[in-house]
């Protein structure tokens, strides 16, 4: 959607001014449309605050990034310590601390981040194949680097199987393995396999046994067509951008077994799913698979731009020296943030907090079905999707936008919720920080229920 006028709300003069300035000076292309377009002055824990002083519960975690919550003091203290920023108080024009960029050099903090992340991955069930890292600053870059390595592993094997309806990015090969064969400007080296959308449309349907026959047949047909050129399968633990669709674990296990049978690489893009988001530390544990390459990002550094392709040494070493380098990979700031995030998970039992929160979220979202505005609920851990229903003469897409807008405006007591723009048109993602207080989360789920009830009147 491309608004011709800035989004405006009553009683938000400062926010409205910022919205108008953004619309005038930045292109539409840099942001996803959200009917609320929340203006944030500062954030703390599980809440955002607007220039007018309004408080909003953050049910987005900044698109699955702030798994620890926004600006945890202990995390920031760790980041500052790792960077040596205490030297800022020593006086002088320049501080003696770790540089923010170290291109064409290496740092001790980078080495520490490497060791800590590899140790964490290898200690997780399913992480035994992982022994090298390629760092990046964004998810798309991590995807691209992993695919470069896979395509160079065996000369002549440069074709990729991706999941139809998946999302891996908008750039280069990451964009090529996103979507389906119907998209424009499709890379001919990419083929797609179906995803069991109907079978996991709701948490109840996901409990049913999954018939793998048709998916196996698709894979066999692709092997027959282009097996001599195939190098890998790339998929997600769950389809995030495709509508928060969480498959039965047998589906991912089928893809992995196909790779094992044909000596293909199994690449799991869990950039939206890692660091506790689906329950355990890594989604591959949750789905009981053992990928050759795993893609990490978002919650990896709790807000500092960082991503990584982690996987087999024999695969990554197919790339030439410097072939996957870029200005910001493994920069000291992101390295410090990754180490600090690992510290927080290891010392504060964040996983247990997320699992407790998950039960509250599931019950609260299932209750929303009573309003008749919600048709399906699906998810796991602290990442959920509620699929809106057609209601009266309103299509489900409009219902979703109405809910997002009404939650932003809040109830009569001013209690409000920040939500992302709808996925796949009519699916609202619910993904608060794993550290959100359980009672507070329950309260805002109740607020959301009351708002939906009012919209349904």
Residue positions per predicted region:
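Conserved N-terminal phosphate-binding loop of PLP-dependent enzymes in the Aspartate aminotransferase
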Residues: 2-457
């Amino acid at each position: 959607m491309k608004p011709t006028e800035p989004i405006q709300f009553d009683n938000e003069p400062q926010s409205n001014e910022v919205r108008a300035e953004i619309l005038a000076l930045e292109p539409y292309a840099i942001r996803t449309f959200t009917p609320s377009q929340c203006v944030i002055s500062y954030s703390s824990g599980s809440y955002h605050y607007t220039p007018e002083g309004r408080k909003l519960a953050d049910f987005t975690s900044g698109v699955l990034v702030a798994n620890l919550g926004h600006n945890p003091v202990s995390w920031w203290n760790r980041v500052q310590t790792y960077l040596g920023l205490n030297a800022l108080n020593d006086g002088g024009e320049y501080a003696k601390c770790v540089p923010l960029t170290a291109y064409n050099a290496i740092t001790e903090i980078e080495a520490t981040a490497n060791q800590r992340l590899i140790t964490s991955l290898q200690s997780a069930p399913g992480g035994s194949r992982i022994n090298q890292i390629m760092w990046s600053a964004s998810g798309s870059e991590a995807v691209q680097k992993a695919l470069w390595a896979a395509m160079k592993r065996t000369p002549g094997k440069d074709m990729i199987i991706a999941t139809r309806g998946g999302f891996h990015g908008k750039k280069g090969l990451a964009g090529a393995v996103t979507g389906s064969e119907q998209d424009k400007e499709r890379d001919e080296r990419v083929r797609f396999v179906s995803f069991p959308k109907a079978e996991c449309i709701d948490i109840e349907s996901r409990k049913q046994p999954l018939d793998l026959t048709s998916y196996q047949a698709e894979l066999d047909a692709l092997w027959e067509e282009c097996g001599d050129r195939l190098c890998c399968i790339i998929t997600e633990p769950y389809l995030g951008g495709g509508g928060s669709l969480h498959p039965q674990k047998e589906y991912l296990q089928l893809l992995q077994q196909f790779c094992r049978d044909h000596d293909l690489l199994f690449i799991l893009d869990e950039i939206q799913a890692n660091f506790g988001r689906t329950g355990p530390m890594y989604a591959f544990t949750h789905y009981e698979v053992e990928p050759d390459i795993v893609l990490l990002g978002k919650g990896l550094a709790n807000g500092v731009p960082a991503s990584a392709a982690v996987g087999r040494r024999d695969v990554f070493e197919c790339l030439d020296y410097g072939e996957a380098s870029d200005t910001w990979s493994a920069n000291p700031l992101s390295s410090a943030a990754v180490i600090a995030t690992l510290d927080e998970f290891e010392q504060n039992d964040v996983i247990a907090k997320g699992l407790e929160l998950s039960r509250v979220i599931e019950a609260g979202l299932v209750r929303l079905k009573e309003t008749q505005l919600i048709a399906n609920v699906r998810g796991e851990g602290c990442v959920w999707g509620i699929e809106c229903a057609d209601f009266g003469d309103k299509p489900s897409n409009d219902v979703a936008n109405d809910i997002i807008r009404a939650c932003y405006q809040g109830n009569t007591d001013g209690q409000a919720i920040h939500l992302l723009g709808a996925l796949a048109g009519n699916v609202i993602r619910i993904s608060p920080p794993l550290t959100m207080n359980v009672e507070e989360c329950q309260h805002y789920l109740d607020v959301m229920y009351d708002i939906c009830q009012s919209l349904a009147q």
